[in-house]
């Protein structure tokens, strides 16, 4: 929720050079895409990890880079994941608007949609994680998702199936003995 509040605030109140983008990792809410679309700012989806958009940050090509853990970096302010910056920005937003976070998020969902986002961590073994990494995307063609067609499949960082109005990602953690399952509709 915090990432959406921050992005809406930045795009609606700050000036950025033309050609900048918003970057989010593969596991991060697509509600950010809807906010970016409203302001005609392209969205860039990367694998998990700030290293995948560090170059664009250093060259001031991103308004914001973020991941689902609420790590964020902002144009010309930081070049790595920074939770303290997010807290300060949220304090600025609440002070400027006179609204608390629940009011600000209520405005977001009223404007864009109510996303149903969920992450589940499944304890696993190294062998099971390796099996996930070896799944061939071609074996998933023709499956349905959320009652509709799968419109795209991405396998660079786990397996992500994109439906018409939803997505699901199965991703072995790179740091813990778990498989992370993400879904949003």
Predicted regions and their residues:
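Phosphate-binding and adjacent anionic-ligand microenvironments
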Residues: 13, 17-184
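Cysteine protease catalytic core and zymogen-processing segment of caspase-like enzymes
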Residues: 1-11
């Amino acid at each position: 929720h915090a990432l959406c509040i921050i992005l809406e605030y930045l795009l609606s109140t700050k000036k950025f050079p033309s050609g900048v983008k918003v970057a989010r990792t593969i596991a991060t809410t697509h509600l950010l895409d809807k906010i970016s679309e409203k302001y005609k700012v392209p969205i860039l989806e990367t694998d998990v990890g700030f290293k995948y958009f560090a170059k664009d940050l250093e060259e001031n090509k991103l308004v914001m880079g973020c991941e689902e853990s609420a790590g964020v970096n902002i144009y010309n302010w930081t070049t790595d994941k920074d939770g303290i910056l997010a807290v300060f920005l949220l304090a600025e937003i609440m002070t400027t608007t006179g609204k608390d976070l629940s009011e600000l998020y209520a405005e977001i969902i009223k404007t864009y949609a109510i996303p149903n986002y969920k992450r589940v961590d499944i304890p696993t073994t190294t062998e099971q994680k390796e099996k996930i990494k070896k799944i061939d995307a071609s074996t998933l063609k023709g499956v349905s998702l959320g009652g509709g067609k799968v419109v795209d499949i991405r396998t660079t960082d786990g397996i992500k199936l994109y439906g018409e109005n939803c997505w699901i990602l199965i991703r072995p953690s790179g740091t813990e003995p778990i498989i992370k399952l993400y879904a949003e509709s």
